[in-house]
Structures are given as C-alpha cells and as structure tokens.
Amino acid sequence: MKLLYTDINHDMTEILVNQAAHAAEAGWRIFYIAPNSLSFEKERAVLENLPQEASFAITITRFAQLARYFTLNQPNQKESLNDIGLAMIFYRALASFEDGQLKVFGRLKQDASFISQLVDLYKELQTANLSILDLKYLHSPEKFEDLLAIFLVVSDLLREGEYDNQSKIAFFTEQVRSGQLDVDLKNTILIVDGFTRFSAEEEALIKSLSSRCQEIIIGAYASQKAYKANFTNGNIYSAGVDFLRYLATTFQTKPEFILSKWESKSGFEMISKNIEGKHDFTNSSHILDDTAKDCITIWECINQKDEVEHVARAIRQKLYQGYRYKDILVLLGDVDSYKLQLSKIFEQYDIPYYFGKAETMAAHPLVHFMDSLSRIKRYRFRAEDVLNLFKTGIYGEISQDDLDYFEAYISYADIKGPKKFFTDFVVGAKKFDLGRLNTIRQSLLAPLESFVKTKKQDGIKTLNQFMFFLTQVGLSDNLSRLVGQMSENEQEKHQEVWKTFTDILEQFQTIFGQEKLNLDEFLSLLNSGMMQAEYRMVPATVDVVTVKSYDLVEPHSNQFVYALGMTQSHFPKIAQNKSLISDIERQLINDANDTDGHFDIMTRENLKKNHFAALSLFNAAKQALVLTIPQLLNESEDQMSPYLIELRDIGVPFNHKGRQSLKEEADNIGNYKALLSRVVDLYRSAIDKEMTKEEQTFWSVAVRYLRRQLTSKGIEIPIITDSLDTVTVSSDVMTRRFPEDDPLKLSSSALTTFYNNQYKYFLQYVLGLEEQDSIHPDMRHHGTYLHRVFEILMKNQGIESFEEKLNSAINKTNQEDVFKSLYSEDAESRYSLEILEDIARATATILRQDSQMTVESEEERFELMIDNTIKINGIIDRIDRLSDGSLGVVDYKSSAQKFDIQKFYNGLSPQLVTYIDAISRDKEVEQKPPIFGAMYLHMQEPKQDLSKIKNLDDLVTKNHQALTYKGLFSEAEKEFLANGKYHLKDSLYSEAEIAILQAHNQLLYKKASETIKSGKFLINPYTEDAKTVDGDQFKSITGFEADRHMARARALYKLPAKEKRQGFLTLMQQEEENDDL
C-alpha cells in the first residue's frame, strides 16, 4: 500500500499517471480507479497525461467495472437487476401482503416514492456491508418488522428468479478472499484517484486486494501543514487529511508528500493559502497581487437570465481570442434551476454544450402514451385521458383535422366511459357527420377496445397482447416518423428513451413473466417504471462546453471555469437524509455493529465535504475562474455564499454586472442570433439614457448588417405596438356575405353584439363562428324550455283551473322530443329539469287570468324595414292586449333585465324599442292600436333573505314584487297598469318620448349598417369607466389587453343619475334633427 498526497496547487492525476506509466513499463497490469461521477473526465485526463496518450497496460475504470472485469468468466453468474427491475421486485413483494400485515407501511404499498426509498435502502445496505437483520436497532420495532418482512419476500423472489442478490463488488470481494483470483491479481497494480472516503463495501474490497495485488496506490489532496496539524476540525483539507490518516492507520503505512511537475498559477496558490489560513486558525494571510486578482473574479448579476447571458458572452469572447469550447467548463449551484434558462441562452448564442447529468423521460411522448393508457384503464375512459392518448402523435394514423373534429364531438356529446366510446355515435346528427365520426372512432378505438378487455393472466401473455396492441396502433412507425425530422442530437435522445423502454419491457418479462396480473397492475408497473427512468447522453463531439454541478468538479479541470448560482442556498450544499433510516438510527446501528459494515452519515460529513468542494472549485480553473451570483434566484432574493464572502474579504475582485451594456467593441457582439435578440430587446425597451456617439455608430452599423441578413432570408424583425388595427374584409367576401341587391339583415341581438364589440359581430355574423355546443342543457336551453311552457299555458283556453293548465303545459313540454332527450340524459340534467319546473310554477303566478289583460299572440315573428336597406327580423315572445285595446310586448328572460336609457343610447339595449317599432308599424293592421309598453319578465323562483323579513305577510309581498314586468311604459296607459304587476317607477314615457326612442333606435341600426357594409370592423369592446373593459375582448384572438389597449375601447357616453333620463332624450332629439339635416 502506498499513500501519496500533494497540495491543491499541484496535480495529483499527473503524479498518479506517472506512477502508472512507470509500472506499465516494468510489465505490470494497471487498473486506474476513479469515482463514478468523474470516470469520463478522469479517463480523458489520464490519457492526456500519458506520454504516449494511450497504453494497453493501463485500464481506467470504476470499482464496479473492476469487479465485472475479474468476475466476468466466473461460474454461477446470476442475472443482475437495475433500479427499475428492483422497483418491480419490491412492487411484487408489497402486493403479496394482505391489508393489515404491514403495521407501519401498510398504506404505502402502492406508493411509487416509498418503493423508490426501499430500492435506495436495498442498495445502501449493500454498499454499507450490512444486512436487513442489522436494522434491529431501529427505534420502532414495528418499523423493523415491516422492513424485515418486505426484504425477506424480496430475497425469496430474487432467489426464485435466480437474480443476483448481492452487488458485483461484494461478489468480487468474496472471490478475492477465497483465493480464486490470486493468479490474476499477483501482476496487478491498483491506483485509486479522486476519493476522500470509501464506502464500507469499497473499503472491504481494498482490504482484500491489499494482500493479493502487487501494490495499491492511493492519492489525495492535502497540504503538509494540514497533515501535520494536531487539530483538523474545520480545516479546508480535513476531508483529505482524515482519509489519509485512517488509511495509514488501517494499512500501517506512512503517507508520502509528492509534487507534480505541473503547478498552478501563483495567484491560485496565494488564494488557496489565504483560505487555508482562515480555516486552520493560524490567520496567516497574503496580500493578493494583480496576478491573483486575475485568477478569480466574482460577478453579481441582477437575475439568472442576465447571469447566464454574461457568461455566454464571455464564452464567445474566449472563442474570439482563439480558445475552443472544450477549454471551458460551466458549473451550476442548482442544476434544476438553471438548466432551462442556460439551454435557451446557449442555443441563442450558438454555444454547443453537454449536460453531465442523467435526464428524466417524464416529458417524452412515449411516457405520455403510457401514462394516458394507464389512466384510461384506471379511470374508466375519461374523455381527457382518451384524447391525450390520441394527441401524443404516436397513436394510430389520423389527420389533425379528423382529430379536431373528433374532439369537438366528444366535447359536444359528452362521451365518457367505455360503453359510449365503443358504441356508434348517434347523437347530434344535425350538427355532425356521424358517418365520418364513427369511421374515425372505429379506426382509433378498435385496437384499444380489444386490449382493455385483457383478463387476469400470466404476465408474459399480457405483455404479448400489449406488443400486438402497439403494432396495431403503429407505435414504432409513428415514433420513427416523429423523430425522423429532428436534429441528430434529438434523434439520439429518442433512441435512448426507446432503449430504456425496451429494457423495461424485458425486465417485466423476466420478473413477472409467470406472475398472474390484471391489466391495471400491468400498466401501473410499466408506467411507474417509465416515470422513474432516466437516461444519459454521450456528447457527440469533444469540442463542447461541459456543464455540470459544481460539487462534482475536480481541481484543475479546465482552462476557464464559470460557476453560476453560487448563493448561500446552494454553496455550500447541505446534505439531508431523506431515507427510511434516520441519522440517529444509523449511528445506533454503527455503534452496535462490530463488523466492517457501517452506514454513512452524510449530515455529519457536510463540513468536511463542503470545505473540500469549495477548495476544489476555487482551483478548478487553470487560467481563470469566474464565480457568479444573482440578486434574484427563482424570483426570490438570496444571500451571498459565505465562501464568496471569504474571497471578497481577502481581496478577490467583486464586480457588479448590470444589464447588458451597449458596447461597441467587435468582440462584444457575440454572434448573429445573439445580436438579433439584443436588437429586438433594445427596440422593445425604453432606453433610459442617451447613447454615446461611439455606441450610436456601433448600433447603426450592427442594425444595417442585421437588416441585410434578414432581408436575404426573407425575415422581418417583429414590431410590437399598442395598435390593434384590423384589415378591411375583401369586397368579394362582403358581396357573398351581404349581397348588394338585398337589404342588410339585422336583429336586436345582432345590433347589441355590434355595439358590444364590432369585432365580435365580425366573428359571429361574418365568419359565422359559434360557441362550443353541448348536448347538456345550458342557459339557452333553459330559456327555451320556459318559453315553451308559457306558450302552451297561454294558448290553453279550456275550462280547467290555472294550476291544472300549468301542470298540463309542463307535462307536454317535458314529453316533447327535444326536451325529453335534453333533460333525461343524466342525474344532473334531471335535477336541472326539477329546478326549471319550480321556476315555471313560481313565474306563472303573474300569468293568471286578468280581466284587464288578454294574450293577443305568442311567438310572433316580424320583419321591420328601415329605408329599404335594412331588414330587422325577430320573434316577440308575447303580445298582450289591455281592456282599452292597447298592445304591449312581453319578452321572457332567464336573468334579471330592465330598460336602461343609458345603455339604450349607447346601442346596448335596443330590444324593447325595436319590438315597439315592430308592432306599431304592422302593415296588416289598418287601425293602429295604442302601445302601452314593452317589458321583460324575469322567469325565476324568488328567493328572500329571511333575516330581513319581519313577518310572513312581508314574505308574500316581496315575492310578488320580484315577479313584476319591468321595461318602458306609455304614460297615457298608466291607469290600466296600476294593478301591481308592472314596475312603473322611472319607467313611464310619453308618446313623444317613445317616438324619440324609436327614431334613435333606427339611427343606431343605420350607423351599424354603414360600418358593417364598409367591411372595417374595429376591435373596440366597450368600457363604462375607462378603467375596466366590460365588452367581450376575445383576448386569444385579438390580443386585446386592457392595460395596453384601453385607448382602443369604446367609452360609453354617461350622464349623472339625476340628469340621465332627460339628458339622453335631449341628446337623441338633437341627433335626430342633425340626421334630418
């Protein structure tokens, strides 16, 4: 055993490679061992340090791979399971327990997180050289009994399936101890690099190999000063010193201090000695010279976006200076927080990069496919799950138009549940092409229908049916077609996902092939495996910027290093124990165990680990290190790392980097896409300072260059303005939609729509767009139902009592096909019908026979011409006649309505006046009867707040007051309207005033007609207070935003409440006079 150490300013890898090269020349077989997280980088570093840059005698590997190398040809080798396979084994084990058998974990049997924790515990017991029986010292006996029961079942399953129940390292250690490998090992030298501690499993292997290998050489970083110190707690080198001292005691050897030929820049050495002095309590400090200040710099940025952009531009400058991408390393304090932002900005700056981290499959279409399939079976064909499966793009062959049409029908007919999906669609023949829909349904659902009928059977049979199902829906062909149009890098990602998917299927076949499973269990197993699976990518080329977590970095890793997100929250990283075994329980087990096995207690190693990670980070660069921190991290303020505060205190430069400055140097441009992005950002922003002459010159030249580039590619810089100008509809479209020889057809509702927002009229009446319909009744259907009840009721002139007539009307309406199908679909529809019947009975109290009023007609259609250019169509719900022969119009409403002269003036309430105009100009009646009014009847079941009712008589009175006609009435007919059924307060108008209202109403139609025929429709939803928009905005179509486009809204003309009535009448009269002129 040889132990070597050197300080952080020298290169331990170079030292160990020299040892390996000399041993290889002497004829020894060398195995160079590196940690799992550093194996790729370490292999490259070793090869670069070898004199010939290659050697057949030297193998760079890991402990686990070393075990496989020596035991590959050993007899009785069992099949190993990966994490997904182990998860399936634990799932199968937990499924075997009956309810109540597991006292602590019984409710977590199917929980994916719990199964993942069990897998982690299983692997940790192996690396700790412990067995499940060693957990008997847990605080809770019930917890130990549950874990023991679970692991015993798992052991039985592994033994039955002839799977390997020990790690490769443990098996290798047994083989070494047995002496079976002595011949192979006697000519072997083992070199270990990059470790500051060994797991119990690795330590046991080292002990076994130490007496059988020719030599074991272990290297670590530590200064002579630190190694000779009596007290090392808190020392920056404590991890390496404690590691060396433990090995020295265990193997009875003295560590040797050695120097490499390569030595870091003096500036890094000076900073490292200052940091060491702060942590070994000697307070030895060295004033930093300019060389040291050039080595390390701290940047403070505004947010993550600016932070990454500054680094991206710095990388582009290094390329401008002649360096390569491979000379640059980017480290992240929190990979998850920075990954998306860094990916977008690096692609914008054309910087190729490689993330040294396993990627999850959760966002892949194949995972969505499996998740949707599992949900379909579990939740019995919810519409959203079925549609999500079809939308993955890898299920079946269907055009986007057909899929949209199918989705529209599913929403309309509320298709859900297997019965509705697997039978022909029959509802909605008037609105949809059922033949086309059923063809689509058959092609999409036939394979699914057959697959979901799979019964409980052996896993291999279910898997075969699943594979046949995948063939039927063309999964592999669809996935190939989807991937074929992507970049080579993206194709490789999809290939890795597909490989992982097939591995999961193979694991399932191996583990559950002979196990009886139902389809739910089958899909749940595959889906959980897909959700938890990860894959790794190998960089397509060496010349890329490597990106990884800062705690995985080694000293002297690259020429230039940029460490982002070095805030207090992530630097240092505080390890937390999230396993099933607490730290206190781990310590109890370690204390009670007298074997070589022991649990690692990471929370107690935090200080040593973080100190060494910081020291490694500060020496990660060979030329320059930049540490960056954002003021805002994940939209919250964060503090500076204590390690960065130490650097600042010893004199390391601290720069406040603001937003991207407008510098004119050519090397500051970055690249074409980045420059384009900056120009667009500059155009959008409000420049808060005057540019210098040099900046103006730079940007004018840059923009001219960009414009030439964009013009050559047929691209324009997008211009975002506050304008919402619309294009005039072509004359061909207007002629087809509104023939010139025909009068323009309008209605009171169309007019209201026009004055609500002209663009709404365009969408609804020009383009003919409709809201999504449904077979379930909504407010429109409810109103039609009540209309029909009252129509039948008022036509019944029989001798029956009013209650009998009402019940008869309700029953007849309920039996009509249209309402019978609507209100018998499900419990919700039947409940709606009950409410409607109650409303009909409550509202009907106002319709009882009155000697002063008779119903003249119902559902009266009318056509009203204005200047032979406008034809107004409509249907009047009811026309009443008073005893004096005067007529009145009644319009049924399912919501509260009243005549508001202000809304009428602004075009938002023309209905009642239009109806008065229609019956007063009826050509079929020679002798025009007087008009007593036009009114709304709110169909409702009045509700009262009983806390405000003093006695029951008041309750009846208030109910009657709620059921009154509200609208506008003729003052001349006042005496016939004073029976309490009509709300007359502020609602009486003289004949002259009604004439003014009619004239203004016609003017509203004329103005609307002119605009409509012009084909120019504004986006102008109305606003009452110029602060909020009340009209329909259609944001997703128009892009209207109240805060940016309020000036485009149509402000209603308003008057004070006291002046409202007379003021608007005067305005109407003036407008009429001006119109006549």
Swiss-Prot record:
Task: Report a single Gene Ontology molecular function.
Answer: 5'-3' exonuclease activity
* Cofactor(s) needed by this chain: Mg(2+)
Q: What else is known?
A: Despite having helicase-like domains, this subunit does not have helicase activity.
* Record's keyword terms, sorted: ATP-binding, DNA damage, DNA repair, DNA-binding, Exonuclease, Helicase, Hydrolase, Nuclease, Nucleotide-binding
Question: How is this protein named in the record?
Answer: ATP-dependent helicase/deoxyribonuclease subunit B
The protein's gene is named rexB
> Subunit structure, briefly?
Heterodimer of AddA and RexB.
The EC designation for this entry is 3.1.-.-
* Phylogenetic classification of the source organism: Bacteria, Bacillati, Bacillota, Bacilli, Lactobacillales
Biological process terms in GO annotation: double-strand break repair via homologous recombination
Q: Record keywords: Nucleus included? A: no
Q: Looking at the record's lineage, which domain of life comes first?
A: Bacteria
Family in the record: Belongs to the helicase family. AddB/RexB type 2 subfamily.
Q: Which residues form a coiled coil?
A: none
Q: Which Pfam families match?
A: ADDB_N (PF21445), PDDEXK_1 (PF12705)
Instruction: Please explain the role this protein plays, according to its UniProt record.
Output: The heterodimer acts as both an ATP-dependent DNA helicase and an ATP-dependent, dual-direction single-stranded exonuclease. Recognizes the chi site generating a DNA molecule suitable for the initiation of homologous recombination. This subunit has 5' -> 3' nuclease activity but not helicase activity.
